[in-house]
Amino acid sequence: MTATAVPVPGGRLHVVDEGDPNHPPVVLLHAGIANLRAWDVLVPPLVDAGYRVVRYDARGFGASTTDDVDFSNRADLIAVLDALGIGRAVLVGNSRGGQIAFDAAIEFPDRVVAIVGVGAGIGGFEGEPTPEEVALFDEMEALEEADPPDPDAIADIDVRVWVDGPGQPETRVPAAIRDKVRKMDAPQYAPGHVGGRPVPLAPPAAARLADLRCPVLAVAGGLDVSDVAQAARHLEAQAPDARAVIVPDVAHMIGMEIPDQLAALIVEFIAPLPRWS
């Protein structure tokens, strides 16, 4: 394992590179309630399957830093690829990381071999949440807009919604997973935290899915918020080469809940692709 800091305009990205550098590269992009440690249990089966696995903390997350500047998450991803000498990569993105993956594939199509969206967001996509989900989202928004916000209270509701799944018992997911996500999530809302200002892709990806030139696998959990599966189905219908898989009995953090099963889905999807580097 090699850890490095990649400089980007106004910040530095904490990057971890594992596996044989001569093997095809797979880049893992974490969710907005997490950092690169969310992928700890997914990396070993991917490395064992013969892939070079790169993951990094996005700006404002984990050990990455940023000034209070405008920036592009797509350009940051390309900066990581360039720093590691990677021409093209498979992108595996969870939630916000999936949105970054789709945006990057539209803006930089020659750098992306394929995408695996894991509970992935799509910029500009508006689903149809249930009334219960709307109430939860309203509660989350109120906590985030409080002055000052309570990081622990925000992390608690994020765990209820995204880790347990809406309406699911706290005992459904092992306590170690819940605690790990809580510890990754809360620092984003701490006093003095600087996250920068990500500049969205324009027009957003939801209106440009037909422009995706790479194959896409969209994996959604059956216990996740309803618009995640809706986004996966929308992607399957609109992108030229996309397939949706709904995995029952898991929620949003699929890579933490069932890493071996997710790794198997990823490998099955990317193994037939022509070798890349």
Listing of model-derived features with the role each one plays in the protein:
Residues 74-89:
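Conserved acidic catalytic loop of the alpha/beta-hydrolase fold
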Residues 9-65, 80:
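Conserved HGGG/HGGXW glycine-rich cap/lid loop of the alpha/beta-hydrolase fold
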Residues 93, 97, 101:
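Gly/Ala-rich beta-loop-alpha elbow adjacent to hydrolase catalytic centers
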Residues 102, 106-107, 113-147:
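Flexible "cap/lid" loop of the alpha/beta hydrolase fold
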Residues 240-277:
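Catalytic active-site module of serine/aspartate enzymes centered on a nucleophile-bearing elbow/loop
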Residues 91-93, 118:
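Short beta-strand immediately N-terminal to the catalytic nucleophile in serine-hydrolase-like folds
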Residues 147-203, 208:
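Conserved alpha/beta-hydrolase catalytic His-Asp/Glu region
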Residues 182-237, 246:
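Conserved serine/cysteine hydrolase catalytic core
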